[in-house]
Regions:
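Glycine-rich, Arg-bearing micro-motifs that act as flexible, cationic patches
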Residues: 103-128, 139, 143-147
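Short helix-capping segments at alpha-helix termini
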Residues: 70-76
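Small/aliphatic-rich secondary-structure junction motif
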Residues: 2-49, 53, 152
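Charged docking surfaces used in two-component/phosphorelay signaling
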Residues: 83-91
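A short acidic, glycine-rich active-site loop
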Residues: 51-62
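Glycine-rich phosphate-binding loop signature in dinucleotide/nucleotide-binding domains
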Residues: 95-101
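General small-molecule cofactor/ligand-binding pocket signal
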Residues: 34-36, 80-84, 135
């Protein structure tokens, strides 16, 4: 796995869960990870305006936070960051292609089918468009185990 693992970071829990899973795999395999925050301020407005700058700042904050956490837990993993001014799915696929990544890791935040259809789902789009394998990781909250019912 010379190209490593590209990870989609969107500022939410599912991207962080994907990053943790990717770091754990990267540590086992001896490959780097690339945290990717793709953003498009507005397809209707001018590029480089205040909205786009604010979204990029959110991306910097999110990737910095998860990078710090990952580096502390997996110091052997090389972690890189790319902020890409493209739609998130396009950004992930482009970075994976440019870096010859072996896989893309994305989170699944539990959007229902209707919300995903209305809002769009980066995970869905990457899974269906990427020529590379895609690892889909549930949000950290999704893998909590419910406590066993109390005995009567």
């Amino acid at each position: 796995m010379s190209g490593g693992i590209v990870v989609g970071i969107g500022g939410g829990g599912s991207g962080f869960a994907a990053a943790r899973t990717a770091a754990r795999l990267a540590s086992s395999l001896g490959v780097p990870i690339v945290l990717v925050f793709g953003y498009e301020a507005s397809p209707l407005g001018p590029r480089g305006g205040p909205l786009e700058e604010r979204i990029a700042a959110i991306g910097e904050e999110a990737t910095s936070q998860i990078r710090t956490e990952l580096a502390a837990q997996w110091p052997d993993v090389r972690i890189e960051v790319e902020l890409v001014g493209q739609r998130p799915a396009d950004a992930l696929i482009a970075v994976a292609e440019a870096r010859s990544a072996e896989t893309i890791a994305v989170g699944h935040g539990g959007l229902g089918p209707l919300r995903a259809a209305l809002l769009g789902s980066v995970t869905y789009e990457v899974v269906h468009r990427s020529p590379r394998p895609v690892l889909v990781v549930p949000d950290d909250d999704d893998d909590e185990v419910a406590p066993a019912p109390a005995s009567a």
